[in-house]
Amino acid sequence: MAKYEILYIIRPNIEEEAKNALVARFDSILTDNGATVVESKDWEKRRLAYEINDFREGLYHIVNLEATDAAALNEFDRLSKINGDILRHMIVKLDA
């Protein structure tokens, strides 16, 4: 299984319950498509290097996972581009 790390930035003005629901939804998208979520944690609220969608700060969230194929990653990528609460995301394959 290949190891991946996903970092995504959530808009800062989201309510806590909505943020928790968003994180749970995207974690379940990964697990429903065959990936194993090793760790999913909030990093911190950070100032952005440049303004994104009129926001100067964002809530960073990190997910470490293992996947045998790219189906889960492709679905995460597709849905995170559509979702307005996620400002940016990045998927990185870690060296084993």
Curated annotation (Swiss-Prot):
The keyword Mitochondrion does not apply. One of its GO terms (molecular function) is structural constituent of ribosome. GO terms for cellular component: cytoplasm; ribonucleoprotein complex; ribosome. Keywords: Ribonucleoprotein, Ribosomal protein, RNA-binding, rRNA-binding. InterPro entries: Ribosomal_bS6, Ribosomal_bS6_sf, Ribosomal_S6_plastid/chlpt, Transl_elong_EF1B/ribsomal_bS6. Gene3D superfamilies: 3.30.70.60. GO terms for biological process: translation. Coiled coil: none annotated. Binds together with bS18 to 16S ribosomal RNA. Belongs to the bacterial ribosomal protein bS6 family. HAMAP family: Ribosomal_bS6. This is Small ribosomal subunit protein bS6. It comes from Streptococcus pyogenes serotype M1. The lineage of its organism: Bacteria, Bacillati, Bacillota, Bacilli, Lactobacillales.
